[in-house]
Amino acid sequence: MSSPSPVTDGLNVYVMTGTGILKGFDFAGKELWVRDIQQDYGKFGLNWGYASSPLLYSDSLYVQVLHGMKTDAPSYLLRIHKKTGRPLWKVERPTPAITESPDSYTTPTLVRHSAEVEIVVTGGDCMTGHDPETGKELWRANGFNPDNDPFHRIIASPVVADEIIYAPTKVRPLMAFRSGGRGDISQSHLLWSFQNGPDVPSPVSDGKYFFSVNDKGIAWCLDAKTGKEIWGPQRLTPAIYSASPVLANGKLYVINEEGLTTVLKAGPTFE
């Protein structure tokens, strides 16, 4: 099982499998080290298997295990030294989520605010920010499951642009928060919310425009700062859309499960 994507620092490559095997390789394919996360910390308990990719920052890999559907074990965040595979810390991430809602298939991301860097994690009906040096939780945003749906797992990952954190959930709500908060930022740092977000594909933003494509190929463009709808809903070729859109050179590349790529202009008009 290889749902997670590999990451590289340009010198080595790091791979996490769906069965919890985390390895480092050089570019010649030589294995540098290996860790078995399930052996070290217990079996994963996600309903659909493990799928979060590791986050690479500075000298470390950050690995989230957010689960609950098939386990009573706590969710946690790990920091692993990229050169040796040695664990540097493990912190638990408690939430009140129940049944399948603790499960998260997202990948953590970074947010930079002024001179500070934080690890952003979504899942378990909330979003948290962590100190990359210690793992300490710095802030938390709640309200990700307003209907208390016991099956409100999250698949689409958070994204960051211009110090704004965009956090999708299971379609709704998709919320945008300004960075720099401490403690409970659920209301104090909330910028806007959107009720037509994706389930599986992660959104993308260039800081000016925010683009979202849902599982049915319905595309939207919002003002990244205010959440105002610029265009959408616009239907792409009917199919299932699971891959996240890619933004490059002023264009938005969207691939569906039939292998068709749609290229859109990444701007205020749908074309």
What are the roles of these predicted feature ranges?
Residues 1-271:
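Noncatalytic, solvent-exposed loop/strand surfaces
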